[in-house]
Amino acid sequence: MKLFLRSHAVLILLFLLQGLFVFFYYWFAGLHSFSHLFYILGVQLLILAGYLAYRWYKDRGVYHWLSSGQEGTDIPYLGSSVFCSELYEKQMELIRLQHQKLHETEAKLDARVTYMNQWVHQVKTPLSVINLIIQEEDEPVFEQIKKEVRQIEFGLETLLYSSRLDLFERDFKIEAVSLSELLQSVIQSYKRFFIQYRVYPKMNVCDDHQIYTDAKWLKFAIGQVVTNAVKYSAGKSDRLELNVFCDEDRTVLEVKDYGVGIPSQDIKRVFDPYYTGENGRRFQESTGIGLHLVKEITDKLNHTVDISSSPGEGTSVRFSFLTKM
Amino acid sequence: MNKIMIVEDSEDIRGLLQNYLEKYGYQTVVAADFTAVLDVFLREKPDVVLLDINLPAYDGYYWCRQIRQHSTSPIIFISARSGEMDQVMAIENGGDDYIEKPFSYDIVLAKIKSQIRRAYGEYAAKQGEKVVEYAGVQLFVERFELRFQDEKSELSKKESKLLEVLLERGEKVTSRDRLMEKTWDTDIFIDDNTLNVYITRLRKKLRELNAPVSIEAVRGEGYQLRAQS
């Protein structure tokens, strides 16, 4: 209603001016009868009121819609007047176009993810062949090849997960998961990595705590942090701690290493995509995508992750989980 | 002798699996015509089927359903697909187990054994006590028992596992990494120093048995067995 009055303020003002003009015109023309003058003024105001009432009746849908908060993309029926139905049509058209664009983009994204998945699977077969061929061989050359193959496998996995992340909403399942079992399976799947770099994990778990999460995604995220920790500990320290602390309503997992640490100017940006920092330059093999994925995944899973480090002494990454739903 | 049928469109993987399984005493059959997998199955009557999902013509799920109409033999899927859905589909279409690529020989062998044990029972299980032998030295893997001629020696679980790997590989160099990996069990594992200790202990046990085998260190590479004449 306010909006309606405001948008017709000029009209009302105009009518009032006109009224005053007519009033004074007749007054100075010699018509000094108040009853006549007020009659003319009254008729004019009545006509104005009639017009406004008519407009309000016809267009009230639009004004209600405009002044209400926007919830969703639906447009209510606006009214039957020419103005209203035209506006309605136009809006619908616009929404249709937007939807179409959105669908096209989504379809493209889908196709991209499918392509990526297929591509990864295609590469996995020759990788399996290489693996099978060199599995029984232990000479240094083959150890080297094994190491490189492992690197490719890690890369593929990261690729797979980062492309799936865009469709996360369709690909996750929150359930009660035992954190210690999850950690054990992480350790199991990275054991070759630990051996290669001679860094040994140690688990300190308070009790067997259940957390609510998606096991697959969380495993991947922890795996990323663990591989980082191992990579930056190699040759400096052979310890990697996986500590679990339990609070009343939170469970905290700390992945603590005694490696090279992260320079203080880099620590704020380690979760940024493609940010590699000084360690990235010093150690190569860094894409700057791993920790970014970790952050994205933990956000989506409703966990938090933070990182602290002192250069030369080590790094600790802390995941925090709600223990209750 | 158990017969394994391999249905896999990558020729390399097929060949490697075939070699490996034959080395471990299995008979193998491969299906090379992917439009007639069922015919091969019915003709050869294998004990276990290894089945890829992505195949030309029909996919693995289809063949699994076809085979299931005639037989209940164990079917193990092997596929590069890593999604949960694919594994669920595999089991729901009648598969018994699922191996994800890239895989290791050990996994394939272990899963085949377990399927045979489950499907054909005692008969196969009895055959299955694993004995590893090198230069007359025998290791009874399941009992952690080392034998040479009439002498016996008990080993710990870790020692037995280490020696199993060493005996199997014999003169081939075995890297420290491999030994560590084979003995790794969740968060209980052998690091470099402990590995040295274990090797020393194994050498002592072999000496006590008067076994004509010695564990030689190969500098920078690992260990190898040498038979003394």
Swiss-Prot record, chain A:
It comes from the Bacteria. It is a multi-pass membrane protein. Residues 118-325 form the Histidine kinase domain. Residues 30-33 are extracellular. Pfam families: HATPase_c. It is an enzyme of class 2 (transferase). Signal peptide: none annotated. GO terms for cellular component: plasma membrane. The keyword Signal does not apply. PANTHER family: HISTIDINE KINASE, PHOSPHATE REGULON SENSOR PROTEIN PHOR. Probable member of the two-component regulatory system YxdK/YxdJ. May activate YxdJ in response to the antibacterial protein LL-37. This is Sensor histidine kinase YxdK. The gene is yxdK.
UniProtKB/Swiss-Prot annotation, chain B:
It is found in: Cytoplasm. Residues 3-116 form the Response regulatory domain. Pfam families: Response_reg, Trans_reg_C. This is Transcriptional regulatory protein YxdJ. GO terms for biological process: regulation of DNA-templated transcription. It comes from the Bacteria. It comes from Bacillus subtilis (strain 168). Residues 129-227 bind DNA. Phosphorylated by YxdK. Probable member of the two-component regulatory system YxdK/YxdJ. Positively regulates the expression of the yxdLMyxeA operon by direct interaction with its promoter region. Could also indirectly regulate the expression of the dlt operon. One of its GO terms (molecular function) is phosphorelay response regulator activity. Keywords: Activator, Cytoplasm, DNA-binding, Phosphoprotein, Transcription, Transcription regulation, Two-component regulatory system. InterPro entries: CheY-like_superfamily, OmpR/PhoB-type_DNA-bd, Sig_transdc_resp-reg_C-effctor, Sig_transdc_resp-reg_receiver, WalR-like, WH-like_DNA-bd_sf. The modification 4-aspartylphosphate is found at D52. CDD domains: REC_OmpR_NsrR-like, trans_reg_C. One of its GO terms (cellular component) is cytosol.
